[in-house]
């Protein structure tokens, strides 16, 4: 599981992440932070490195995600078969630029996150690297990026920033992306967006 700029919002994660074998914090946070900025998983004999980096445009100051990924790719490229990157960023131009940078470093897939809105620009860069600007989110369908509609509207119409709560609703949307790779060349052959809505109140 990758994370993002809210990774430290709950204090419970401080100790948990050190013992977790599946939770990744942003790689370009300071090294003194808890946890690790990448993990290596083996799936059906294929070693996959998964890392998470934060963008810097309209975000809190962090180390360069470009340099952080370059250093990581050089360190692990001979140890794994595939490298997947979750780039948690706000600006589209920064995300697209990062995709091309990652492609030149030998990364196999880059999927953006953070905006909670799935984009329709899935592509394969130079017949090698899978890319999508934002994979979207999983959460309440009748919401404003997962948050309560009335509270969100109050923020926009009154400039009063009350607490925003996650909507508890039986109608949920599911976003994601699926990649298909060539077993021999390791190049991506297909990028497929996943998006559907399910009403759990109708489930018996």
Model feature map: region roles:
Residues 2-204:
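Acidic, metal/ion-coordinating pockets
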């Amino acid at each position: 599981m990758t994370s993002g700029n809210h990774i430290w919002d709950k204090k419970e994660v401080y100790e948990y992440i050190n013992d977790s074998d599946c939770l990744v914090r942003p790689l370009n946070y300071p090294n003194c932070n808890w946890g690790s900025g990448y993990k290596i998983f083996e799936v059906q004999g294929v070693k996959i490195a998964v890392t998470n980096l934060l963008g810097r445009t309209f975000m809190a100051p962090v180390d360069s995600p470009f340099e952080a990924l370059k250093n990581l790719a050089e360190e692990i490229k001979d140890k794994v078969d595939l490298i997947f990157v979750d780039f948690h960023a706000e600006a589209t131009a920064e995300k697209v630029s990062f995709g091309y940078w990652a492609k030149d470093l030998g990364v196999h897939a880059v999927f953006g996150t953070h905006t909670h809105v799935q984009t329709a620009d899935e592509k394969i860069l130079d017949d090698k690297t899978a890319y999508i600007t934002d994979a979207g989110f999983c959460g309440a369908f009748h919401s404003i990026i997962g948050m309560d509609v009335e509270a969100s509207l109050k923020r926009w119409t009154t400039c009063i920033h009350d607490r925003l709560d996650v909507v508890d609703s039986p109608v949920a949307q599911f976003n994601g992306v699926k990649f298909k790779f060539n077993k021999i060349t390791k190049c991506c052959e297909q990028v497929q967006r996943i998006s559907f809505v399910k009403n759990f109140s109708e489930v018996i």
